[in-house]
Amino acid sequence: MGCATTSVKIASIVLNAVLGFLAAGAIGWIAYNADTETEEFVIAAYIACSLILVFALLGIFAAIRESVVLTATSAVFLLILAILQIVSTCLFLHEFDVKSGRDMVEVAWQANNMDSLQQKHECCGQSSAQDYIHLSLLIPPSCYADLQQTPDHLYLDGCIEKVQSFYESDKLRFIIVSWVLVAFELICFALAVFLAISFKNKQRRMEF
């Protein structure tokens, strides 16, 4: 096996490993943010990232074993995954509306269920702590950092602004992660095609 093929083989193993780690990280990120997304999105994202992880591992195994069939299989499925992900990401960009932070906070406010939002997003009230004061209510402990009810630990930002910012950042993170995964999938696909051809040529030379 030539130096070029050896270099590509090593690069393929490394990049597939990186792709696998990215997919595993994406699964962890989805699990952490599952409560902020629709059930359909979470299930689809789990399936997609799990498939990416499986075929990244297959790519590593195929390169190590120098298997033409496994390398070609890995290449085909990585290309299919990349195409599907490009289509889904483009649809997401054009059709997905960022969730309304105002709606989320207003529902929690009406249900008197602000504590989890205030602690998670480090905010207080709908617009500020004044929302409680205007209603002659005590500012709840969840409005304070580490639940320490002192003025210097009070969260100053309102939850509508913080939750909306979280949703917008969440969408941006998803888009970035999605395009990074697509880039790695396409690179690993190209390397797998090169390796499949190289392994096939090696087999032919060994037959003579």
UniProtKB/Swiss-Prot annotation:
InterPro entries: Tetraspanin/Peripherin, Tetraspanin_EC2_sf. The chain crosses the membrane at residues 10-30, 41-61, 67-87, 174-194. It holds the Pfam family Tetraspanin. One of its GO terms (cellular component) is extracellular region. The keyword Nucleotide-binding does not apply. The keyword Transmembrane applies. Transiently expressed on motor axons, growth cones and terminal arbors. Keywords: Membrane, Synapse, Transmembrane, Transmembrane helix. It comes from the Eukaryota. Its main location: membrane. GO terms for biological process: synapse assembly. It is found in: Membrane; Synapse. It is a multi-pass membrane protein. Belongs to the tetraspanin (TM4SF) family. Facilitates synapse formation. This is Protein late bloomer. It comes from Drosophila melanogaster (Fruit fly).
